[in-house]
Amino acid sequence: MTEYKLVVVGAGGVGKSALTIQLIQNHFVDEYDPTIEDSYRKQVVIDGETCLLDILDTAGQEEYSAMRDQYMRTGEGFLCVFAINNSKSFADINLYREQIKRVKDSDDVPMVLVGNKCDLPTRTVDTKQAHELAKSYGIPFIETSAKTRQGVEDAFYTLVREIRQYRMKKLNSSDDGTQGCMGLPCVVM
């Protein structure tokens, strides 16, 4: 069974835990209890493949920012979550993305931009803005509601698909026949 290490990042109060719990336990948590760090595991079938999702739900509060580098190192893919009724959380996405790229030492890291709380009528972040940001990053954008479950599976499953594509790309680029297992050219005698 293939395992995927997913990390949910974003500002405090955007619904990272609510999204994760909705996926794992199929229920909505409406009281706000700031997370320090929680880990969840769930077995799912995505595109006919049985997968084990190892999901790290992270702290959005600034006082826990020192922990970010550590979980960013171990994560394979990132759900970058903002709340559609919180413009500051949308602006913060770039900070998370830049930190992920720095820690991973790569511009090519599987990510999905997630606009949560789409069930709320008080939108301050336009869908078009979010689509444009995602397009500029070269990543998918999905609107979700942890309350109604809209887009929840889609967000996590899309991230798994992004990780699969990334793994295949890495496999193909290292499997071009020019390098042996020690990183040296092979010589047939």
UniProtKB/Swiss-Prot annotation:
Note: Mutations which change AA 12, 13 or 61 activate the potential of Ras to transform cultured cells and are implicated in a variety of human tumors.
Region entry Hypervariable region, spans: 166-185
Name under which the protein is recorded: GTPase NRas
Gene Ontology, cellular component aspect: cytosol; endoplasmic reticulum membrane; extracellular exosome; Golgi apparatus; Golgi membrane; membrane; plasma membrane; tertiary granule membrane
Disease: Leukemia, juvenile myelomonocytic: An aggressive pediatric myelodysplastic syndrome/myeloproliferative disorder characterized by malignant transformation in the hematopoietic stem cell compartment with proliferation of differentiated progeny. Patients have splenomegaly, enlarged lymph nodes, rashes, and hemorrhages. Noonan syndrome 6: A form of Noonan syndrome, a disease characterized by short stature, facial dysmorphic features such as hypertelorism, a downward eyeslant and low-set posteriorly rotated ears, and a high incidence of congenital heart defects and hypertrophic cardiomyopathy. Other features can include a short neck with webbing or redundancy of skin, deafness, motor delay, variable intellectual deficits, multiple skeletal defects, cryptorchidism, and bleeding diathesis.
Role description: Ras proteins bind GDP/GTP and possess intrinsic GTPase activity.
Organism of provenance: Homo sapiens
Regulation: Alternates between an inactive form bound to GDP and an active form bound to GTP. Activated by a guanine nucleotide-exchange factor (GEF) and inactivated by a GTPase-activating protein (GAP).
